Amino acid sequence: MKMNFKGLVDLHTLPKTTPLLPLYEAIINSIQSIEDAQISNGKIEIIVERDKQMNLFNQWETDIENIIIVDNGIGFDDENYNSFDTYASEYKIQKGCKGVGRMLWLKAFCSVSIESIFVEEDKKKCRTFLFDANHAVHDMKVKELSSDVLQTTKVRLNGLR
C-alpha cells in the first residue's frame, strides 16, 4: 500500500485551544524514555529559541521559532526508532499511547530533527534523523561513539507555524 504522508499529517488536527499539545507530547515521550531507562536521576530540559527583532516602536519582539527537548532516557535504540518510524505503532500501547502523537509536532512545526545517544549491544551509538510532512522520517544515520559520551536525546521542533 502506498501512502501520502503529508495527507496523513493533514488528517490530524491541532485545536487552537491547545497550542502546547506538541510540547506536551514531547515531554511525555521524554518521561517514558526515562522510565524505560530505569534511572533515578532522570532529567528533562526544555529550551525555547526566539527570533529577536525590533518593531516600529524600538521594542524587542520575540516570537518562538524552535523548541528543543533534551532528556537522558533510553533513547532511540533500534526498537524505539522502528516504533517512531511506524505510524500508529502499538509499541507503547500498554502505556496508553496510540503511536500518532508525533503528528502533532508537524501540525505546529515545520520539521523535527532528532539526535539520540543510546546504548545498544553494550556500545554507545548516536542516531540522527529528520522528520517532516514531505518526507516522513529521512536522513537517518547511526555511528558508534566512545563509551564516555553521555546518553542523551535531543528533539528539536523547528519553525513554529
Predicted regions, residues:
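Bergerat-fold GHKL ATPase/HATPase_c domain
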Residues: M1-M54, W60-T62, E79-D85
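Beta-strand secondary-structure signal
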Residues: E45-I47, N66-I68, S113, K154-R156
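Short amphipathic beta-strand and strand-loop transition segments with alternating hydrophobic
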Residues: I47-N58, V137-S147
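Short beta-strand element(s) in the Bergerat
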Residues: L56, E61-I67, T153
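Acidic ATP/Mg2+-coordinating residue in the GHKL
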Residues: D71
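A short glycine-centered beta->alpha linker in the GHKL/HATPase_c
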Residues: G75-D77
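GHKL-type ATPase core
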Residues: K92-R161
